[in-house]
């Protein structure tokens, strides 16, 4: 599940981040985005799309991800702001907030889905990314827990 990250690591990049969000489905509640960076080649076998994991497994992996990741950022946009700007803009805002919370500046960002408004770093949009990228899958777990 590191093939996409490997593409950038093999070009000499060290800090490849994955972003995913949770909370776009509920009628009420915040949208939460997470951004995760792993050390080159650092693989966690059990990581996969958070929707395919039990609550117990997500909680276990949450702790492992925080322990092993070089950086984890979380962005939250609350209901009042969602009502003000709409869910799509709120999702993009949460993504950008999560990047701003990282302790390490990414050199490239993998975003789950076909589009985003992330402009400060180079981006690859990965449809179904939480099944294809460990960094995105880890972000989906962090955002969901």
Feature locations, PLM:
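RNase H-like, Mg2+-dependent phosphodiesterase core
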Residues: 1-145
């Amino acid at each position: 599940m590191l093939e996409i990250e490997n593409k950038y690591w093999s070009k000499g990049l060290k800090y490849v981040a994955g972003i995913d969000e949770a909370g776009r489905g509920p009628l009420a509640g915040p949208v939460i985005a997470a951004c995760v960076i792993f050390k080159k080649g650092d693989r966690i076998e059990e990581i996969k799309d958070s929707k395919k994991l039990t609550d117990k497994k997500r909680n276990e992996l949450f702790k492992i991800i925080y322990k092993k990741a070089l950086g984890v950022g979380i962005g939250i946009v609350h209901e009042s702001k969602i009502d003000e700007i709409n869910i799509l803009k709120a999702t993009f805002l949460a993504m950008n907030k999560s990047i701003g919370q990282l302790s390490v500046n990414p050199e490239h960002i993998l975003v789950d889905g076909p589009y985003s408004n992330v402009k400060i770093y180079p981006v690859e949009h990965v449809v179904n990314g939480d099944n294809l990228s460990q960094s995105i899958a880890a972000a989906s777990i962090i955002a969901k827990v």
